[in-house]
Amino acid sequence: MAPTRERLIAELRRHVRDDRVLAAIAEVPRELFVPPERRRSAWANEALPIGGGQTISQPLVVAHMAELLRIAPGARVLDVGTGSGYHAAILARLGARVWSVERDPALSEQAAANLAAAGIEDVELIVGDGTLGHAPAAPYDAVNVAASARREVPPALLDQLARGGRLVIPVGERLVLVGRDAEGRLHHADAGGVRFVPLVEGPAPD
């Protein structure tokens, strides 16, 4: 029996307390963000391959990261690692204006088609090096990174985080939450174990 939206939300509800996040997960059609041959499994609580060595993140991880970021309507959000566009879609559904950076032009193009099919607006897609963020639209109220940094948070992403902002990034196999307080100081906290594809510097090879 194929997984269903209702079963996924019931499973997530055991771990996620923010009803806005649960509603966003329920409302964004995940099947539009996976390859056609994976659509039967779209509502499974698992990561799925999307091509190019990349994956669409497990819904529980997406929900956990969104909950940590505390996205308010109208927030300016940097999303690093667009992939199929699913993470950006959830952030936009929470009311954010999203700038999403992807190093692979083919993935970014597919994400644009996926977002359009889902009727998701307020997402600007950028092809570039995600470790550098997107300075023209900075500072951001939240930064979401859907790929794992090897040793540390890229400095450019910290520089682009607004006062009062929150950044979530996997570093190795740990999820790290960084907050910038009203005085500009940074505070780091461990937010649990995760597994992500690596965050790679520079453009994708031709």
Region locations from a protein language model:
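Conserved nucleotide-cofactor-binding alpha/beta core module
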Residues: 70-187
